[in-house]
Each structure stands twice: as structure tokens, then as C-alpha cells.
Design a protein with these regions (language model features):
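N-terminal charged helix/coil linker that caps or initiates catalytic domains
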Residues: 1-70
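E1/E1-like adenylate-forming module used to activate ubiquitin-like modifiers
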Residues: 1-21, 141, 146-147, 152-153, ...
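Glycine-rich phosphate-binding loop and adjoining beta1-alpha1-beta2 segment
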Residues: 37-38, 96-134
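Glycine-rich adenosine-cofactor-binding loop
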Residues: 61-98
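Hydrophobic residues within alpha-helices
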Residues: 82-83, 126, 174
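Ligand-binding beta-strand-loop-alpha-helix segment within the catalytic cores
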Residues: 118-153, 169
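Oxidoreductase and adenylate-handling cofactor-binding alpha/beta cores
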Residues: 236-251
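Intrinsically disordered, low-complexity Ser/Thr-enriched
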Residues: 254-265
């Protein structure tokens, strides 16, 4: 066993490695914090930050998540919550794509927006936020608009994409690019009290069934608005779908769409055509 691995094993306590020993190992053996976390998981040692995951997510599962690459398209109402939850879950690489900067009207619902970062690029704020949560997670910030022309390069290497967009045309382009790359994507949308989530695989036609008019830029959210709580709920369900896919769970929202009515407190499933 390499010396670094022996050191990590010796520093663990009841199968857990606390952050202090991450930093010591990184400095002692000239490793990145990402490399230390990966070595610990390879040894079957759970970083202590994930201790409360253990009853649900095993060390092997945690390793799967850490080896995964997720692309989040959009870093607004949905995207901020999705990035936060994926980082805390231990996804090893997260690409975040968004061209915008934070503005005052984002403050009601976008988790990363504060009075102090008005005018700052959303993806750069996301990178700083993730680094403050877990420096072992690699976040790739891309301040650019997603489209059909650049989509394949922006999603390169991703295992799954997550829709956190606010316009229909780009959502349809994302669906097309994911089909070309043969990767699934988790679809989520919010409007007022209402939300919808589904997981689409290459060949699924839900997007084009829902949005037959590909020239329409915005959906009903423009009329109903977006309060603080609806993106938080929908984003959490999207993050769950991502983790279930990466862990090989079969109970995905494929072939069905989850609709959420927070006003009536009702959740329904709608069967969709593949």
C-alpha cells in the first residue's frame, strides 16, 4: 500500500476521516484535497462530512458520486439549489453553465445571491460557494450561454445534465444535445406555486411533446412569477434524480412526470410517452 494510503488509513477513526487529516495528508504527500478524498473513499474510508449519509449512502455509493461529473445548465433559482445540494452530496465534478451576473431581482429566490455580490458572475460565485463547502469538489464555472452549437463541448465528460433553465428554446436545445451525446438529463420547471420534474433518456420525446412551439422563449413562469420556495422544492427533487441515476437506482422519473402543487399541497404523477 502506498505511504499516503497507509497514512490516511492510520488517521481514520472508526472508518471516518476528518477534515484536519485531509489537509495534513495533502500537505505531507503533495496531494490535492480532491486526491486525498478519492484515496480515502478508495480505501473504504468515509470522509467525516458524509457521516450522516451512511445510513442511506454506503462508502461504495459515496465513491460513485465522487467519481461522477454532473453538468448544471443555469445558475439561477433552480441552479443555485441544485449545485449546493450536489456539492454537499459529494459529486466530484460539477460543471455550471450560465452567462449572467447577479441582479437585485434575483435576491428573492436565488440561493447564492447576496447584496454583496450584485454584478458578480453567477458561475464564479457558485465556484466560491462550493469551495467553501467542500474544497475537494471540483466546480468548473462556464460563463456562457448554452446552445446547440457549443452544447457538445460544454457537456463534454458529463455523466448527466440538469436543466435549470428559464427559457423553452434553450431547454429544447439541451434535450437535443443530450440525445446526441447519449446522456440523460433531468428536466425541471417552476411557475408560481407549481413545479414539474422528469428524467429523460436519449429517445424520450417529452420535451417536444410539452413544447411543440420551439420558437416560444418563455413559459408560464413569466405570468405566475417565481417565489422563493418553489425552486427549492423542485431543485431538491432534481438533485435526488441525479443521485439516483448515478447510484444505479431504478426508481427514476422516466416515462412519468412529477407535478407539484404547493398551494393545494398535492403531488401527482403523469405518465408520459417515451
Amino acid at each position: 500500500m502506498p505511504e499516503a494510503d497507509l497514512f490516511i488509513a492510520e488517521c481514520s477513526d472508526n472508518g471516518l476521516l476528518d477534515w484536519h487529516w485531509h489537509m495534513v495528508a495533502a500537505e505531507k504527500f503533495q496531494l490535492t484535497l480532491t486526491q486525498v478524498e478519492r484515496r480515502a473513499l478508495d480505501l473504504g474510508i468515509m470522509p467525516k462530512r458524509y457521516q450522516r449519509n451512511q445510513a442511506t449512502i454506503t462508502v461504495d455509493d459515496q465513491l460513485k458520486l465522487f467519481k461522477s461529473h454532473v453538468a448544471v445548465i443555469g445558475c439561477g433559482g433552480l441552479g443555485c439549489y441544485i449545485v449546493e445540494e450536489l456539492a454537499r452530496a459529494g459529486i466530484g465534478t460539477i460543471t455550471v453553465i450560465d452567462p449572467d451576473v447577479f441582479e437585485e431581482h434575483n435576491l428573492n429566490r436565488q440561493l447564492f445571491s447576496t447584496m454583496a455580490n450584485m454584478g458578480s458572475a453567477k458561475v464564479e460565485v457558485a465556484a466560491s460557494r462550493v469551495d467553501s463547502i467542500n474544497p475537494a469538489v471540483r466546480l468548473i464555472p462556464i460563463q456562457d450561454s448554452f446552445n446547440r452549437a457549443n452544447g457538445s463541448s460544454l457537456l463534454h465528460g458529463a455523466d448527466i445534465a440538469v436543466d435549470a433553465l428559464d427559457n423553452i428554446a434553450t431547454r429544447l436545445e439541451l434535450s437535443t444535445v443530450c440525445k446526441e451525446l447519449a446522456i440523460p438529463f433531468v428536466f425541471g420547471t417552476v411557475a408560481g406555486w407549481y413545479g414539474q420534474v422528469s428524467t429523460l433518456f436519449p429517445g424520450d420525446t417529452l420535451m417536444h411533446t410539452m413544447y411543440p412551439d420551439s420558437t416560444k422563449e418563455h413559459g408560464i413562469e413569466q405570468q405566475l412569477g417565481t417565489p422563493a420556495f418553489t425552486p427549492a422544492v423542485v431543485a431538491s427533487i432534481e438533485a435526488v434524480e441525479v443521485c439516483k441515476f448515478l447510484l444505479g437506482k431504478k426508481q427514476l422519473l422516466q416515462g412519468r412526470s412529477l407535478t407539484i402543487d404547493l398551494l393545494a399541497m398535492e403531488v401527482d404523477q403523469i405518465e408520459t410517452t417515451a
